[in-house]
């Protein structure tokens, strides 16, 4: 029975739960089946949320602080603002705030306490504007892993952290579904990190857009497979109900029917169409009615602050808050709701372990592999880096990496440093830093050219590493050294790579012939992969702002 499962789970996590701050006012919320529940009494938790962040896309509003290096504003690090705004959240019956970018180097204690005292939970995105999974050239690498775990380390101590988003609208149409494999790998690894760190079991999920061609497949994809790999919850940024509408005519009925069999909680990670202002928010009564609460776990209205996009509930000027008509309508509707709530006492033991079969990739609209990218392993990358005989010179600017990748990958097969989320194939060094990956392929070319000194030069951009060590002991925790990664279920081609962990080349060559310049003819990388690698590096070093 579920009561036995819950008792065992409670015992297993008792130590970590006792360390959570503010538990008396905001007991931890847990996931069981397709709903959230309060851990202390088993009552269903429905999200009554507001998106809470200014300048989430990366610009800095004047007056927030004078730090020129700040890339975004972390609202949970501004205690004065939290004190200013909490009354408006309480008055509008709010129990959840979504924050899109956390600064893990800032202090969040005071804001988290303010919101906990008000019964408010936080669901936070793990990325930030310049460190996120890029839908056009997706990676799951060490920089992202470090960023994500750093946010978790900072926020895990608070009982009113409801969960973490590992991505927001990364895949947004049929052309970039492969990016979802990288987000799902991030979810898998963050769940594992939380568990291995002995933190309480904080849910990790994904926030999707509402694209009609992929919305069913993407929901199934993130909720399918093993319990270790799948998302703990699934959010949809939903803007279908505009002005005066109904459950049937808005599309809500169809969306509810489409995901009614989802085995994890689903909710509106954003909602609030602004085609007509002031917004009436008549959808709130339906969202929290019996028509939807068995399938949906509430929603997060977009957004608190009035900005250029005209989605705000209030206008803020310094410490002055002016409520808009949108806020008044929202507040009125939120204070009318009286939803029926489920309870864990009605669940069976199977509810906690149900899962879905992953969507196939035969259809043209869905191509994300179930074989996921490997876990980024810093010690493995360091080991490989130390073993390379030819490396990129330390004085080479990162801005020049793209040209070097383009040059060397025109000579050899660079699949060892590339990743393909549609085929489920991930190179042995695909998650390492740009510098390590560039050194890897420079070394591969150097070995392929029989260690000719001229093959490790590239006009002074490469140099011989006289301290190179044997690489036979380089082993990745995830098993990536053999080209393997995890599979979240279903059938997909197993990940593989043509290069060994030592960086030696195994690309095919012609029958001993060489070009007039003395360069062996080797298997060249496909133009698609080559352009992809160059674009990734260019975006990285150029500080490209991507969707997060």
Curated annotation (Swiss-Prot):
Induction of its expression: Strongly expressed under conditions of alkaline pH but not expressed at any pH below 5.5.
Lipidated sites in chain (GPI-anchor amidated serine): 517
Annotated GO MF terms: 1,3-beta-glucanosyltransferase activity; glucanosyltransferase activity
UniProt KW Lipoprotein keyword: yes
Gene Ontology cellular component terms for the protein in this record: cell septum; cell surface; cellular bud membrane; cellular bud scar; extracellular region; extracellular vesicle; fungal-type cell wall; hyphal cell wall
Prosegment location in residue numbers: 518-548
Keyword set, alphabetical order: Cell membrane, Disulfide bond, Glycoprotein, GPI-anchor, Lipoprotein, Membrane, Signal
GO terms (BP aspect): adhesion of symbiont to host; biological process involved in interaction with host; cell-substrate adhesion; cellular response to alkaline pH; cellular response to calcium ion; cellular response to pH; development of symbiont in host; filamentous growth
Signal peptide: 1-20
Span list, region Disordered: 483-518
Glycosylation sites: 41, 173, 261
Entries under Pfam families matching the protein: Glyco_hydro_72, X8
Disulfide bond positions: 82-111, 224-358, 242-273, 381-432, 390-456, 409-414
Membrane topology: Lipid-anchor; GPI-anchor
Major subcellular location class: membrane
Locations listed in the record: Cell membrane
Gene3D superfamilies named among the record's database cross-references: 1.20.58.1040, Glycosidases (3.20.20.80)
Function: Required for apical cell growth and plays an essential role in morphogenesis. May be integral to the pathogenic ability of the organism.
Similarity annotation: Belongs to the glycosyl hydrolase 72 family.
Protein's name according to its UniProt entry: pH-responsive protein 1
Organism this protein belongs to: Candida albicans (strain SC5314 / ATCC MYA-2876) (Yeast)
Lineage start: Eukaryota, Fungi, Dikarya, Ascomycota, Saccharomycotina
């Amino acid at each position: 029975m579920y009561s036995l499962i819950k008792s065992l789970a409670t015992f297993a996590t008792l130590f970590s739960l006792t360390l959570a701050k503010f538990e008396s006012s905001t007991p931890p919320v847990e996931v069981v089946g397709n709903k959230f529940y309060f851990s202390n009494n088993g009552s269903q938790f429905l999200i009554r949320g507001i998106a809470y962040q200014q300048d989430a896309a990366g610009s800095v509003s004047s007056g927030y602080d004078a730090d020129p290096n700040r890339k975004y504003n972390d609202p949970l690090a501004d205690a004065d603002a939290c004190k200013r705004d909490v009354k408006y959240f309480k008055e509008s019956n709010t129990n959840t705030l979504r924050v899109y970018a956390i600064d893990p180097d800032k202090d969040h204690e005071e804001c988290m306490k303010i919101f906990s005292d008000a019964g408010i939970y936080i669901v936070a995105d793990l990325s930030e504007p310049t460190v996120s999974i890029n839908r056009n050239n997706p990676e799951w690498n060490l920089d992202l892993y470090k960023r994500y775990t750093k946010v978790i380390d900072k926020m895990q101590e608070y009982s009113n952290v409801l969960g973490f988003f590992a991505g927001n609208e990364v895949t947004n149409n049929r052309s970039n579904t492969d990016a979802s494999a990288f987000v799902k790998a991030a979810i898998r690894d963050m769940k594992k990190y939380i568990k291995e760190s002995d933190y309480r079991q904080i849910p990790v999920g994904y926030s999707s857009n509402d694209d009609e061609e992929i919305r069913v497949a993407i929901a199934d994809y993130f909720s399918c497979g093993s319990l270790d790999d799948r998302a703990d919850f699934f959010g949809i940024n939903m803007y279908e109900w505009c002005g005066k509408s109904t459950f049937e005519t808005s599309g809500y009925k169809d969306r509810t029917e489409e995901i009614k069999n989802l085995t994890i909680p689903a909710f509106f990670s954003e909602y609030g169409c602004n085609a007509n202002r002031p917004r009436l928010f008549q959808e709130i009564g339906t969202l929290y009615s019996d028509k939807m609460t068995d399938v949906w776990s509430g929603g997060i209205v977009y957004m608190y602050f009035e900005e250029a996009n005209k989605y705000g509930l209030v206008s803020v000027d310094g410490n002055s808050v002016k409520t808009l008509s949108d806020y008044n309508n929202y507040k009125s509707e939120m204070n009318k709701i009286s939803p029926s709530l489920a309870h864990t006492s009605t669940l069976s033991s199977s509810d906690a372990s149900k899962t879905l079969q992953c969507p196939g990739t035969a259809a043209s609209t869905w191509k994300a592999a179930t074989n996921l990218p490997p876990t980024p392993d810093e010690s493995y990358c360091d080991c490989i880096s130390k073993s390379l005989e030819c490396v990129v010179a330390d004085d080479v600017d990162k801005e020049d990496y793209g040209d070097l990748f383009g040059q060397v990958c025109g000579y050899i097969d660079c699949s060892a440093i590339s990743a393909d989320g549609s085929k489920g194939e991930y190179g042995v060094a695909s998650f390492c830093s740009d510098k390590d990956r560039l050194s890897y392929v420079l070394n591969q070319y150097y070995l392929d050219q029989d260690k000719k000194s001229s093959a490790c030069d590239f006009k002074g951009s490469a140099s011989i590493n006289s301290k190179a060590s044997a690489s036979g002991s380089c082993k990745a925790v995830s098993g990536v050294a053999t080209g393997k990664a995890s599979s979240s279920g279903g059938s997909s081609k197993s990940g593989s790579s043509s290069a060994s962990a030592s960086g030696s080349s195994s690309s095919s060559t012609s029958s001993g012939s060489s070009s007039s310049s003395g360069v062996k003819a080797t298997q060249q990388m496909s133009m698609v992969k080559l352009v992809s690698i160059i674009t990734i590096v260019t975006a990285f070093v150029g500080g490209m702002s991507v969707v997060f």
